[in-house]
């Protein structure tokens, strides 16, 4: 710390970032601030699940992720295990508010409904405390009491009444207005009703609302009246006020129930409001959070059900108007031109963040959007090569360069993977042929030689698809591979093979092999494969890695110690495999190898199973909604009776006029959206809110440049001769609500640069202590040459202490200026969320 003081004298103050303008200091609160939520993490494994009571104690388990009770993600089934190992990563945008993020562990049942073993429920406000940590969570028992969620809007009033015999009493008026976010029952919206009770030491008067059908957000708007008995000592002189001894003993209890016609009604939650809230006021109105029963089921011990290992990272970004991000973007975008690159803002970001992955994804997206990624990766890869002494270890570590390039391949290489691997992966996953070649793992009736032939056939087919795909390799990947190859050859001039291994270590090891191993993660398959197929894909992935590596070496040796794998790999030691690998690597690392510009093949964007409402029908009924397989390309949206069948209906992308959400009240169904096109409006129901959001986003982006897009739309359906939203009778009536703001035509499909810059700002904000440490290290190096006394200083890569110090000062200045509008927005948000409002409901009793 002592070195920091003289550093200020040794290093000059950093100038402002050139080419940027300060945003006007107006009222930014009046402009739109986008609040965007996302969740990523990994479900590792469950342990010590309860066994079956019979002789077969094993279970077939899977895990789901739920926003409250809405399932948004499901793992593969792990068969015959009480400690299933899932090891599945997830990432999704969260398009709505929620109370709990829950993980349910199920036992798969073929003949009956899947059995819920237990769950992990984490309150939204507690998610940040678990961020980035591997944590074991105890599974909790599941019953109606543990599933309580939602809130109630309530109004209480106190009136004075004179009875028929002339006595005076008080009348308590209870207005139950609405509920919001009630739990799902068996995955469906419930049929809720409420009981309203006035409870005291000697009374329990109960009344009941009407049942509302198929909704999680019922609008009751029912009023109930209760007489409050007065004590004999009451006189008119005591004014309009309930006496203290009566107030303290009375409370209003509201219980929510799901109406079950044939079985017992299901408890949904309760609230208790003491009548003394009216002590100082004749009325009280507020939202209350539903609570479980006080005497809930406490018999099951959480530890008895097992535990679940998770890693979670929940982010909530407050994205300001674009002009606020100008200085930070300018600082980041000049990073490729900074000499040395280790003194650039982008490189410093990677140095100081706790988890480099948090910085890499937004950084790659931002640089890619502005065509700055290739020179930046080239510069940081060159820095990696300076520290690499062994040619066999080239680009094998998890440096900033390797992580940036890996993320870039995931972003730009999606279509490349689909056209290259999807056909053969579909064949592998749908054929269910056994490829197990380890005698120890063979199933009864399997033949090793037959399995070996199956595996050879698949590996050869995958290999042929890869080495024949160079024409489809994205240009930006080719440009970076070319740079890597040139730098590797320059660094190790006496090794003719290193230029190939520099490219192979990315395209085979970090791209194709990973996609083969986890096709669902790359959107190559709609569902996770079964256990046998997972094993087949693992063997194929390992073999492809080895062959790709062999093509870059003079000596071809297997790393596998198992003789069965070594014997199998001998089948691929023909010279043609090595020649094909080198030819492929030559083609994708040449500056002349670009994407074919004349291809008319549409880009496959998204597919999945959803429900659509029959077009042209006027009756409301379940049979009007049919399950269909939807497929979106860059040219058209189609739906099919089943996956792989011919299209039943096609909507050209150029004919899409708008894509908007549809109000739940239209068909009493959640997660609906509408595709408005030139012929008719197509109503679609997604399986959950995350899926609906992804489809809406992708459809909006692919049709964003259509010249005939609508400026307004109807948020409800046209049924029985009128629009449900505005009651207009003509189907051609212009929309009654403005369309969602469109995306500017110059923004690339997958990149929201303001959000990516906001993410980078958040990473810098969370890493300020380490940034300060790096600044002190620069000062120490400038003053004291040689080994540094502070051990933490050696962890930083500082080639030019003066240049690095100046950049750090610019970063700190830019972050401080961004802090101001963020703090103003947070204060405004917290002050507007009054306790008892819908956004901030009352929890428990108030007095």
UniProtKB/Swiss-Prot annotation:
Residues 371-588 form the Ras-GAP domain. GO terms for molecular function: GTPase activator activity; phospholipid binding; zinc ion binding. A zinc finger (Btk-type) spans 706-742. Residues 603-704 form the PH domain. Its main location: membrane. The keyword Cell membrane applies. One of its GO terms (cellular component) is plasma membrane. The record marks 396 as: Arginine finger. Widely expressed. Higher expression in brain, placenta, and kidney. Zn(2+) binds at residues 714, 725-726, 736. CDD domains: C2A_RasA2_RasA3, C2B_RasA3, PH_GAP1m_mammal-like. Inhibitory regulator of the Ras-cyclic AMP pathway. May bind inositol tetrakisphosphate (IP4) and phospholipids. This is Ras GTPase-activating protein 2. It comes from Rattus norvegicus.
